[in-house]
Amino acid sequence: MQPWSSVPVPKVPGTARPLRLFDTAAGEVRPVTAGRTARMYVCGITPYDATHLGHAATYLAFDLVHRIWLDNGHDVHYVQNVTDIDDPLLERANRDNEDWVVLAMRETALFREDMEALRVVPPTDFIGAVESIPEIEEAVGKLLASGAAYRVDDDEYPDVYFRHSATGRFGYESNYDEATMLDLSAERGGDPDRKGKEHPLDALLWRMARDGEPSWESELGPGRPGWHLECSVIALNRLGMGFDVQGGGSDLAFPHHEFSAAHAEALAGDHPFARHYCHAGMIGLDGEKMSKSKGNLVFVSRLRGDRVDPMAIRLALLDGHYRSDRSWTADALTKGSARLARWREAVALEAGPSAEPVVERLRDRLSDDLDTERALLAVDAWVDEALCRRGGDAEAPAAIRDAVDGLLGVQL
């Protein structure tokens, strides 16, 4: 798959700050100690409802990580997948009497357009699950051979499952107890009640072909891959073990990221899969959970269709800590639009207060676990002074414009 078009990132003068992020596995904010090439994997969309604001908020958070690494002089190898074969996609296609391939292609194209409009720096590798099936088949074979996987006792559908206990470390990423894991597995695409499994938590690796479902010929038998293993294989084969950041929404901490790590660690015989597990909060609507079942998803494309400036959307989503569950409201968008207008007015002036202390504060805030709320306030303070015609630095408006673009991704 091809990602969206590249987004220019201005170089910001001054001294960058090393990044610190909350690590779900450690339960604390820790330094992210990347090498010359920083490596990140962020779980992508299942392309049937793209791009809602929950998606957007997650990818904006990890876009900031990308930008901070660039500011620190790192090369960045960023991998993002597309889950272009999975039960929710097939269910939507069946509901709408649409070919699942056509649906996935259309929604993936829409996602690319939305990401480009929001000025998200594209991944180095943008990889679909379908194109990765040969790699996934090979991985399932290795897990079976090592004893980390088994076939269920089912003559009709002898699906392949992963022994969750295979690495001896299962649970280290999410830190949930078994009862919580079982509840979340049932809620989030698992099948704890599947007959023939050795343990309710064991996860699907290869689903044998069923009537009416797409499948691929394989030495494993005709079928299709399980969700968690797709990300394990795509990340492992492109980034290797011990990459810097595994990212996604907080609903992916378990079971998805826990199993992705366990699968990869069983395959590699090494630990850890990622050195930082980082999760973004959920976005609600007017105080309620935003979900497909409630029918209250807000889509970036529809806002753009209503002529909302994508930079106002970006500012509205950045006005809150990325790890917090937040609510999208009309007031939030109004505030983002007003802020954007004031910032653009200020950087269009011939002069303003010195930009240097503002850029320092921006870097300080963003490097401290992506504290975007206080980063925006730092720019607001400069804008207030500039619009009051205080300060005579003729280079300041352009410097602020470039810093806001380079570090926050907001084009003024």
UniProtKB/Swiss-Prot annotation:
A motif ('HIGH' region) lies at residues 45-55. It catalyses: 1D-myo-inositol 2-amino-2-deoxy-alpha-D-glucopyranoside + L-cysteine + ATP = 1D-myo-inositol 2-(L-cysteinylamino)-2-deoxy-alpha-D-glucopyranoside + AMP + diphosphate + H(+). The keyword Metal-binding applies. The keyword Zinc applies. It holds the Pfam family tRNA-synt_1e. L-cysteinyl-5'-AMP binds at C43, G44, I45, T46, T58, N81, V82, T83, W227, G249, S250, D251, I283. Its EC number is 6.3.1.13. Binds 1 zinc ion per subunit. A motif ('KMSKS' region) lies at residues 289-293. Keywords: ATP-binding, Ligase, Metal-binding, Nucleotide-binding, Zinc. It comes from the Bacteria. Zn(2+) binds at C43, C231, H256. GO terms for molecular function: ATP binding; cysteine-glucosaminylinositol ligase activity; cysteine-tRNA ligase activity; zinc ion binding. Transmembrane segments: none annotated. A motif ('ERGGDP' region) lies at residues 187-192. Its cofactor is Zn(2+). Monomer. NCBIfam families: mycothiol_MshC. Catalyzes the ATP-dependent condensation of GlcN-Ins and L-cysteine to form L-Cys-GlcN-Ins. Belongs to the class-I aminoacyl-tRNA synthetase family. MshC subfamily. This is L-cysteine:1D-myo-inositol 2-amino-2-deoxy-alpha-D-glucopyranoside ligase. It comes from Saccharopolyspora erythraea (strain ATCC 11635 / DSM 40517 / JCM 4748 / NBRC 13426 / NCIMB 8594 / NRRL 2338).
